[in-house]
């Protein structure tokens, strides 16, 4: 339909840069690999950054022409959080977090510890968080302390595996505590973006995998 309606595309962009991504995999001790995207057409392919793809999607499909854009996910190539100023046709990146510091990786590691599949079943943990009215304080404090003092959540389950030796930390207590820590960090981020000197309108577009955490989006 698109080809019939608009004709042949002038450019085709891929949503991330696999070569930059490979450098991060080398850094993390993972085996780098690259498989070119397969297209049925002979178009010249251009790569863009993962977070720029998120930001562009959020802004250019929105009703705003002057706004801040916040992107948070587990990880792009290296970036895990980016903040952008969008005005007119332009997107300008203001600041970022880079791997291994990642709010999304923290949530995924805790999802795995609680017994669900990381990078897929975080929505189940988000729902399970509602079972308790308040987080179990020792677990909440342990997660928050880890976030404040050690950003190596890329180690995944091994990050929190030692908790199994501690009787005060049970997997069933993790969802509510993890959600509470996530929301605390998220509120701080939103406050910083809202108060940024370039936020002229008060608008914020939030995109990326963490935007699916609808419980936190009420802020």
Model-assigned labels for residue ranges:
Residues 176-201:
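Phosphate/ATP-binding catalytic cores across multiple sugar-kinase/actin-like superfamilies
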Residues 68-172, 218-219:
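A short helix-loop
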Residues 17, 74, 208-210:
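Active-site metal-binding loops of divalent metal-dependent hydrolases
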Residues 2-44, 56-57:
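Short beta-strand-loop/turn "lid" adjacent to the catalytic site in phosphate-handling enzymes
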Residues 45-48, 168-184:
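Short acidic-aromatic active-site loops that bind/stabilize oxyanions
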Residues 47-70:
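Conserved phosphate-binding catalytic cores of ATP/NTP-utilizing and phosphoryl-transfer enzymes
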Residues 58-59, 66, 188-192, 210, ...:
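Active-site pocket-lining segments that scaffold enzyme catalytic pockets across diverse folds
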Residues 203-217:
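Glycine-rich phosphate-binding loops at beta-strand->alpha-helix junctions
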């Amino acid at each position: 339909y698109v080809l019939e309606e608009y004709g042949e595309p002038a450019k085709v962009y891929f949503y991330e840069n696999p070569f930059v991504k490979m450098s991060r995999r080398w850094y993390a001790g993972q085996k780098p690999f690259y498989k070119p995207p397969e297209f049925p057409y002979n178009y010249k392919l251009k790569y863009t950054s993962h977070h720029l793809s998120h930001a562009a999607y959020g802004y250019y499909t929105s009703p705003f022409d002057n706004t801040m854009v916040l992107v948070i996910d587990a990880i792009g190539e290296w970036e895990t959080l980016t903040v952008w100023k969008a005005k007119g046709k332009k997107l300008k990146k203001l600041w970022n977090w880079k791997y291994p510091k990642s709010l999304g990786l923290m949530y995924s590691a805790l999802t795995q510890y609680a017994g669900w599949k990381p990078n897929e079943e975080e929505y189940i943990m988000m729902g399970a968080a509602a079972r308790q009215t308040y987080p179990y304080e020792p677990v909440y404090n342990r997660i928050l302390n880890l976030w404040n003092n050690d950003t190596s959540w890329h180690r995944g389950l091994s990050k929190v595996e030692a908790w199994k030796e501690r009787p005060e930390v049970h997997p069933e207590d993790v969802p509510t505590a993890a959600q509470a820590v996530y929301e605390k960090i998220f509120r701080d981020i939103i406050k910083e973006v809202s108060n940024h000197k370039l936020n002229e309108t008060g608008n914020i577009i939030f995109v990326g995998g963490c935007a699916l955490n609808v419980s936190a989006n009420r802020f």
